[in-house]
Regions:
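Loop/turn-rich, solvent-exposed surfaces of beta-rich toroidal or solenoidal domains
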Residues: 229, 325-326, 357-415
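Blade-level signature of beta-propeller repeat domains, shared across WD40, Kelch, NHL, RCC1
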Residues: 430-476
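Residue position within the beta-strands of beta-propeller blades
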Residues: 9, 59, 102-105, 172, ...
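Short, conserved, GDST-rich strand-edge loop motifs in beta-rich repeat architectures
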Residues: 104-116, 172-190, 326-358, 446-464
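Residue-level signature of beta-propeller blades and closely related beta-rich strand-turn architectures
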Residues: 13, 63, 108, 176, ...
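Short coil/turn segments that connect the beta-strands within blades of beta-propeller domains
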Residues: 4-6, 54-55, 99-101, 166-168, ...
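Beta-propeller blade signature
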Residues: 69-74, 115-127, 188-204, 249-257, ...
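Extracytoplasmic beta-rich repeat domains
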Residues: 1, 28-51, 76-94, 111, ...
Length: 476
């Protein structure tokens, strides 16, 4: 987060304010949490960033607290508890400020929790509203859950939503249902694997779209919702774009949730396509066999065609730029038994991956046509990139490698223009800003995250853990 010449950086253990021109630390505030907290966090002891509003910095903590700090001094101004870690909840999400409300999501779907989005008063920390992402039987959508399965239904909200101030609408992606074993929870399982359009003042839902009903493959839909104006069938249209974890690239009319396009952008075998009238996937025998308890090889894997790392859209080229994954996974259900604060997935986690033949590229930085899903160019990587992507008005695309290279590509051709070795894996989101007539680009470097935890990629064994901020000046 960069604001008025100051870079605000968060980790799981601290918040820092750094002078953007000199790199001098202005203040640092430590984050304390109970020692047992990391055991409850699914997929990385991390924090995804901060928000700023009226002189306050807002962030979340691993033990599911929302805090406000004085932007000038780092002094804690208020702290509110969103959920109980003993029940399996945690927080890594960056808050979003929309229409004078601080919005936060929650993690914990792998622990048998029930997801939600909260609204908070930025001045006092007062809790204003909560929108449950898994409805109870007396709420709209409650009939898509059988019995009491909704109580453990998942639907985490661990990636920040997008705000359209013109329509005063927040678009927030919802995670996978719990457990993975879909036989435990018959029905469509709303509003998991969906995008919700919300009024930020009240949390009231304007519309929803579900990408993957009754999903068994951990294809959560939390990844960024990119808002843009583009021409669709000859008409100017306000769209929402999502490179979904299920392998399909979706374009929706963001004013009403109507599906405009849905095409595969990576290899997909769990569905043969998307029904454009209903928006529902046309499932293959792979999905049917998985629900029946048979072991299958599924594409994409449970890490998806793209995971959390944000893509970027360039209105000049009309292309979306995304770090994608090109490997599949082995999937087989197991019985799911719930115990508070412990994993509740119902899946064999001992043999997860179906790697490309001959140890080929496991991921690609792709330039994708949003309306067709077709790739204009790609930059393969033996080890998949897990950083966010930044595209600039100058026609440059920035991304990073898990082995430490920070890279720049030509947005139109994909030609690599430059790279710099940062010394550790890059998994953060690059950011750019202009200050005193100079354009800067910054990125954090520090190896970790879901791929390092679960992939078992020995090629990363010698990558140092890192933990640094790099700032570069862009020269003509």
């Amino acid at each position: 987060l960069v604001y008025q010449g100051i870079i605000y950086v968060t980790t799981h253990a601290a918040t820092m304010a750094i002078d953007a021109k000199t790199g001098k630390q202005i203040w640092k505030t430590k984050v304390e949490y109970p020692a047992e907290t990391p055991r409850i966090v699914c997929c990385g002891i991390i924090n995804r960033g901060a928000a700023i509003h009226e002189g306050k910095i807002f962030r979340t903590t691993l033990d599911a607290n929302v805090i406000a700090l004085d932007a000038k001094t780092g002094k804690e101004l208020w702290r509110e508890k969103a959920a109980d870690i003993k029940e399996g909840y945690s927080m890594t999400v960056a808050p979003l400020v929309a229409d004078g409300v601080v919005l936060t999501g929650i993690s914990g779907a792998e622990f048998g929790t029930r997801g939600f989005i909260d609204g908070w008063d930025p001045a006092t920390g007062k809790h204003l509203w909560r929108t449950n992402t898994v409805p109870s039987p007396d709420e709209p959508g409650g009939d898509t859950w059988k019995g009491d399965t909704w109580k453990l239904g998942g639907g985490s909200t661990w990636i920040t939503g997008s705000f359209d101030p013109e329509s005063n609408t927040v678009y927030w992606g919802i995670g996978n249902p719990g457990p993975f074993n879909a036989a435990v929870r018959p029905g469509d399982n709303l509003y998991t694997c969906s995008v919700l359009a919300l009024d930020p003042k009240t949390g009231k839902m304007k519309w929803h779209f579900q990408f993957s009903p009754n999903n068994p493959f951990d294809y959560d839909a939390v990844a960024e919702m990119v808002l843009a104006d583009m021409t669709v069938e000859g008409k100017p249209t306000k769209v929402l774009m999502n490179a979904n974890r299920n392998g399909y690239f979706y374009v929706l009319d963001r004013t009403n949730g109507k599906l405009l396009a849905a095409n595969p952008y990576v290899k997909v075998n769990w569905a043969s396509g998307i029904d454009m009238k209903t928006g529902r996937p046309i499932e293959t025998d792979v999905t049917k066999d998985a629900r029946e308890g048979k072991k299958v090889v599924v594409y994409p894997s449970i890490l998806g065609g793209k995971n959390w790392e944000p893509m970027s859209f360039d209105p000049q080229t009309g292309l979306a730029y995304a770090n994608t994954l090109s490997f599949g996974g082995h999937y087989k259900t197991e019985p799911a038994t719930y115990k508070a604060g412990e994993w509740y997935v119902g899946m064999d986690l001992t043999d997860l991956w179906d790697w490309p033949a001959d140890n080929g590229p496991r991921g690609d930085l792709k330039a994708i046509d949003p309306l067709t899903g077709k790739t204009k160019w790609e930059a393969p990587s033996d080890i998949p990139r897990f950083s966010g992507v930044l595209s600039t008005a100058g026609g440059v695309v920035f991304s990073g490698q898990l082995t430490g290279e920070f890279e720049a590509f030509d947005a139109d051709s994909g030609k690599k223009l430059w790279q710099f070795q940062t010394g550790s894996g890059i998994e953060g989101q690059p950011v750019t800003w202009q200050q005193d007539g100079v354009q800067y680009v910054a990125v954090t470097s520090g190896y970790g995250g879901v791929y390092s935890l679960f992939a078992g990629d020995e090629r990363l064994a010698k990558v140092p853990p890192g933990g640094s901020l790099w700032v570069f000046a862009v020269k003509n």
